[in-house]
């Protein structure tokens, strides 16, 4: 249903607005069509991909190419490609579900993700009509495989520092590209590369480069810690001849494409961590049930229950946050006509509105998965260190996610800087909110949360938002334009905001479930929410305290810490018991349950 612009939540608006559960999309809102698409993908992964995972891990890439073509036949490569160019033109929820299900396929999910995401979407969103007609049907069918070439040996996070050059030849027919691109996923078998280079040495631009163009080659396979079943090579451009019409977008506007595609890559990465996390919990619960020590299944030990309870509660918050964000994309796009959305740039712009949420999801998702795989190995004990057990590969494969799509450090810094830009543009009244909060804090008498289900959690979310504004406002006031040099404080603020978004997402999802089916049927969700909110609030307090200590001293510090104590004063719940209760349902089902 179309929404008016006034009803669509602004990116970052969650920090200053009271959001209600009926404004949030949740996994419980999946339609029958969504579930059918998810089941189709799941069946394909189980029946076609998993039997060949070991071969793929050993670089038998002919399986990767064949399986991508099979995915194309099923329509799984064309979810984000409009129907007029051979795709399915599905909504973003469907696309996200396909990505989540693919993530069970280990390294192969990287081959899929690089193809349908960063490899194809630059053409979907920014390609000319001729480029779309030429390339998208083959990319949607799997006849052609795509790759994305941005990183260079000397430019990782600083993408605009690229050294690859593009010079128009004397005939004016071809750009001549010279340089090297590093760590290019799918490079062993990709047919089409989206490549960034500087026209005349200074105009950062994007090009569509085919592997058969003169001067295009790849180096040997990289030897990696994880994701061994994905192809990673250097793309070598030795005076590569690229037709003039293969310029993607405008000269000097490559950064617009790169940064928009990074936003998409970030949220898709977060979606992938959901499926990977579910798989590790599944493996860990099943192992804990069958592994006996001291004549008892280790699932019966409370420390194992603590691990599973924590893993699942973090996953619940992550899953809630990610699908909330995808729902925001849909809401934002619903205000446009079908004709408007034929312009892919409009879709990219709709997603870019939520750059903050994309970065938050990327960081929170990758670090949650890292925590889950680490504990998964621990539950497996020595067997978790052995390659014959799937959790060993999951542990190695997880680590790259904190580096992909902009390091987590860069993404953390993006959060406060984007908030600041929105405030300066008048898009979010952050300064006004922070100022009124500081005045309020000097007189604030601690409130008392209600005693009903989730009342304390809703109160904590409200207080956590105040803490975020308190810390951010104080930092902006103290450092002004020099705030970008205080990276530790900026990262603390980002972590506070990240926990706020995750907590609120979990609370709203559970509140929505209670409204739909009652508290008893939502009992597992309530447990996850209570556990996560309390532990995240403890982290928020620690981040805020560390920042205040760095910014203030003496009487001023004591006054600020006193204000913080007013905001964090709640009676803790018994999360040890709640984790035991949450784990019981997971061990019974031998999978993540809600």
Curated annotation (Swiss-Prot):
One term of GO molecular function: acyl-CoA dehydrogenase activity
Pathway the protein takes part in = Lipid metabolism; fatty acid beta-oxidation
Its required cofactor(s), as named, are: FAD
Q: Name one Pfam family in it.
A: Acyl-CoA_dh_M
Catalytic activities: a 2,3-saturated acyl-CoA + A = a 2,3-dehydroacyl-CoA + AH2
**EC assignment:** 1.3.99.-
Q: What class of enzyme is it?
A: oxidoreductase
- Keywords of the record: FAD, Fatty acid metabolism, Flavoprotein, Lipid degradation, Lipid metabolism, Oxidoreductase
What positions does UniProt annotate as the active site of this protein? 405
> What does induction of this protein depend on?
Repressed by FadR in the absence of LCFAs (fatty acids of 14-20 carbon atoms). When LCFAs are present in the medium, they are converted to long-chain acyl-CoAs, which antagonize FadR as to its binding to fadR boxes on target DNA and thus derepress transcription.
Write down the InterPro entries for this protein, in alphabetical order.
Answer: Acyl-CoA-dh-like_C, Acyl-CoA_DH_CS, Acyl-CoA_Oxase/DH_mid-dom, Acyl-CoA_Oxase/DH_mid-dom_sf, AcylCo_DH-like_C, AcylCo_DH/oxidase_C, AcylCoA_DH/ox_N, AcylCoA_DH/ox_N_sf
Q: Which BP terms in the Gene Ontology apply to this protein?
A: fatty acid beta-oxidation
Family membership noted in the UniProt record: Belongs to the acyl-CoA dehydrogenase family.
Its biological purpose is as follows: Involved in the degradation of long-chain fatty acids.
- Name listed for the protein in its UniProt record: Probable acyl-CoA dehydrogenase
């Amino acid at each position: 249903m179309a929404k008016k612009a006034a009803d669509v939540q602004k990116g970052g608006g969650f920090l200053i607005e009271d959001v209600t559960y009926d404004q949030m999309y949740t996994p419980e809102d999946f339609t029958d069509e969504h579930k059918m698409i998810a089941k189709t993908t799941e069946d394909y992964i189980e029946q076609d991909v998993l039997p060949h995972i070991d071969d793929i891990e050993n670089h038998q890439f002919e399986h990767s190419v064949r399986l991508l073509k099979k995915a194309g036949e099923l329509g799984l490569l064309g979810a984000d490609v409009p129907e007029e160019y051979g795709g399915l033109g599905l909504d973003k929820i469907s696309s996200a579900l396909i990505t989540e299900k693919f993530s069970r396929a280990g390294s192969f999910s990287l081959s899929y993700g690089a193809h349908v995401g960063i490899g194809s979407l630059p053409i979907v969103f920014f390609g000319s009509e001729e480029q779309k007609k030429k390339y998208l049907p083959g990319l949607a069918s799997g006849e052609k495989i795509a790759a994305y070439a941005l990183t260079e040996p000397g430019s990782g996070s600083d993408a605009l520092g690229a050294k690859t050059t593009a010079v128009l030849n004397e005939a004016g027919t071809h750009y001549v590209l010279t340089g090297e691109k590093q760590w290019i996923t799918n490079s062993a078998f990709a047919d089409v590369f989206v490549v960034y280079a500087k026209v005349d040495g200074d105009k950062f631009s994007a090009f569509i480069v085919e592997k058969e163009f003169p001067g295009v080659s790849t180096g040997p396979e990289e030897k990696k810690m994880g994701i061994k079943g994905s192809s990673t090579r250097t793309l070598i451009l030795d005076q590569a001849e690229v037709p003039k019409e293969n310029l993607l977008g405008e000269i000097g506007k490559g950064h617009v494409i790169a940064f928009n595609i990074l936003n998409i890559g970030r949220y898709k990465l977060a979606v992938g961590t959901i499926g990977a996390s579910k798989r590790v919990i599944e493996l860990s619960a099943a192992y804990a049930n069958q592994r006996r020590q001291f004549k008892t299944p280790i699932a019966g030990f409370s420390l194992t229950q603590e691990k599973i309870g924590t893993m699942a509660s973090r996953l619940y918050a992550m899953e809630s946050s990610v699908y909330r964000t995808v729902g925001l994309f849909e809401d934002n796009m619903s205000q446009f006509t079908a004709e408007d959305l034929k312009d892919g740039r409009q879709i990219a712009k709709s997603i870019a509105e939520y750059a903050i949420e994309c970065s938050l999801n990327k960081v929170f998702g990758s670090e949650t998965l890292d925590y889950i795989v680490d504990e998964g190995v621990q539950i497996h004990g020595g067997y978790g260190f052995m390659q014959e057990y799937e959790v060993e590969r999951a542990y190695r494969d997880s680590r790259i996610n904190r580096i992909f799509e902009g390091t987590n450090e860069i993404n953390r810094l993006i959060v406060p800087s984007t908030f600041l830009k929105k405030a300066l543009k008048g898009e979010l009244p952050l300064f006004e909110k922070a100022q009124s909060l500081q005045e309020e804090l000097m007189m604030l008498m601690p409130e008392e949360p209600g005693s009903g289900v989730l009342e304390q959690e809703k109160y904590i979310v409200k207080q956590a938002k105040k803490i975020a504004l308190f810390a951010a406002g104080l930092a902006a006031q103290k450092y002004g334009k020099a705030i970008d040099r205080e990276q530790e404080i900026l990262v603390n603020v980002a972590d506070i905001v990240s926990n706020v978004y995750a907590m609120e997402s979990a609370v709203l999802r559970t509140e929505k479930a209670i409204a739909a089916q009652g508290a008893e049927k939502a009992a597992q969700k309530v447990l996850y929410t209570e556990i996560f909110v309390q532990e995240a609030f403890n982290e928020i307090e620690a981040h805020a305290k560390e920042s205040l200590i760095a910014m203030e001293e003496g009487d001023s510090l004591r006054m600020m810490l006193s204000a913080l104590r007013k905001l964090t004063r709640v009676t803790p719940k018994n999360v040890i018991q709640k984790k035991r209760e949450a784990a019981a349902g997971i061990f019974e089902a031998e999978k993540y349950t809600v």
